[in-house]
């Protein structure tokens, strides 16, 4: 994009200047509307989410066998919610703003199998593909006990098929580990940002890791290209996959059940704010969709991105979606938040969800590292940098008086509010790597 075009973009959309300057920004979305009005844009329904949940239930006996760590949840891949009151006090002091209500952490960082939110969508799409192949071959019926898939016969069957994906790390981990376990031959095309330990772990599972010196977009494009020339190769498209999206969306109803068990109320007078780190958008988009179906207009989803990779904010704010990349306006897309190092957002997710998201904000790498250190210090919870992106959210909302006023969030309602920070990864980070993260925190 030349200087004239960038200047025109700034004139039309002034916040672009702040993004170019790598400033931390908060933007509340004027297009946000009710579930009733916003839902038709998604093109998916409650029934689609119910079908996804049913499929995961069918596969639960298989997952119990293949991954013994899932046995305590009976083969269902789900994470805990924990209260983090000491961190809440630390955030109030750090940002100089009162954060009323309760602050909770959703520990997708500690999901079994791959230790990140991607264990939801990535694993679900692999299972969907495996089921389809086995059904078509007459080897499986939906009424069967799916633990039969954990056998040499099925591994032999799946070995003739290939799976490919492009990833900055976590999606590749979940798809690679799951595909290899089933017996597929799998290639993960990894961008320059991907951490060495993630590549190493994948190779230990027998995954073919293809490395690129360029960013996420190139890795995805190359993965797609490889799959196109091979009729037996299935490409999992993080940028445009409704199946991945649905794998994430089952989180909504499950969260509702967890809240019911913990007697956490969400209604008109008890709003729920959920802060989701965003890369290409599939994970947070799918989760936000599920949350909207579960809690309706009482849940308010806000996406968080690094200052160096604000692709979804840029796409939704300008209305250009995947028609613009952060590199087009001179932003380098280089961030320590490797899971969020994406320059061009998913057009599918942006267009599907732009009417159902309350807002977006950015934060610096230094801020993520400091919050990583604080969470470890005050709550003893260790996450990877990108998983901390949601942590400033409660302070951003609490200090945005116009947003609170427009939405009639009175002092009383905010006192009854629940703030949920979605921790997206970090449970499988090697100790020596985590020590480096903690050493980077300036607290």
Swiss-Prot record:
UniProt keyword list: Lyase, Pyridoxal phosphate
CDD domains, per database record: D-Ser-dehyd (cd06447)
The keyword rRNA-binding is annotated on this UniProt entry: no
Listed NCBIfam families: D_Ser_am_lyase (TIGR02035), PRK02991.1 (NF002823)
Name of the protein in its database record: D-serine dehydratase
InterPro entries linked to this entry: D_Ser_am_lyase, Ser/Thr_Dehydratase, Ser/Thr_deHydtase_PyrdxlP-BS, TrpB-like_PALP, TrpB-like_PALP_sf
Entries under HAMAP family matching the protein: D_Ser_dehydrat
EC code: 4.3.1.18
Pfam families in the record: PALP
Residues annotated with N6-(pyridoxal phosphate)lysine modification: 118
Entries under SUPFAM superfamilies matching the protein: Tryptophan synthase beta subunit-like PLP-dependent enzymes
Key word NAD present: no
